[in-house]
Curated annotation (Swiss-Prot):
Residues 226-241 have a biased composition (Polar residues). This is Protein FAM76B. Keywords: Coiled coil. Residues 301-326 form a coiled coil. Residues 143-241 are annotated as: Disordered. Residues 213-222 have a biased composition (Basic and acidic residues). Belongs to the FAM76 family. Residues 166-187 have a biased composition (Basic residues). It comes from the Eukaryota. Plays a role in hematopoiesis and immune system development, and participates in the inflammatory response. Residues 147-159 have a biased composition (Low complexity). One of its GO terms (cellular component) is nuclear speck.
Amino acid sequence: MASALYACTKCHQRYPFEELSQGQQLCKECRIAHPIVKCTYCRSEFQQESKTNTICKKCAQNVKQFGTPKPCQYCNIIAAFIGTKCQRCTNSEKKYGPPQTCEQCKQQCAFDRKEEGRRKVDGKLLCWLCTLSYKRVLQKTKEQRKSLGSTHSNSSSSSLTEKDQHHSKHHHHHHHHHRHSSSHHKISSLSPEPEQGIWKQSHKSSTVIQNETPKKKPKLEFKPSNGDSSSINQSTDSGGTDNFVLISQLKEEVMSLKRLLQQRDQTILEKDKKLTELKADFQYQENNLRTKMNGMDKAHKDFVEQLQGKNRELLKQVAALSKGKKFDKSGSILTSP
């Protein structure tokens, strides 16, 4: 009977259910062609349509509508399209109140989601990025423990089969010896004359068995030591998994610190850019003010000179008028008798 085939959600070709991915139901070729990557702005995972596409659809729409985003004042993720906070932090602040310090990255960007949210991260108060990294580490450790458990179960089953085989052999040998002794008893009951010789033979066989049994005992006594070695292996494996968890946590911390450094560098670059723009604007305004001041000074000087010229002309006119009046008065005095 042929197994049922299921369609890939991307190329719509039919494959067995085991070959498709769990979440997106994608085939192997589509998983390679369209991998799941993180958005450069909001840091959320999305399926990449093309290799050049590094922004999710939501952020692309926001970029078209509001322009390039700024870093959020809480989480420093470059996703603040409106105002100084990203949409995730604004919604969390409305729902859970003001942010608190994250126990992992020590930033003021963790929102207390009460018992429901803390239960998923072992009661720790973590921000969004740190919760994602912590869940990833827990998932990896669970998968490793499952694989280690399967290997231990296989080894224990093989050791149990070996024990059963050894026990069956020992039981078969004991059963054969019991049959041999019963046959000796039957012979002794039938013929009482050679009783002593048969007893000697049976005594010899019993002494041989007694001498042989201690040789076999160490093998049986060696088994718990094997159990102890398996427990030692389990302890070393658990120590290895703990070390792996610590290493993965440290790697996640390094990655988060690198992200923080990149974001800080970007904010510093943006601030430097703003400073240069402000300096250029200040110099431009200063030059404009100087030109205006020079123009106003020149205009003022010209105006003063014009006023002084007018004043001189008026003084001349006043002097001329005063002379004319004197002349008229003297002429009138001479002609009057």
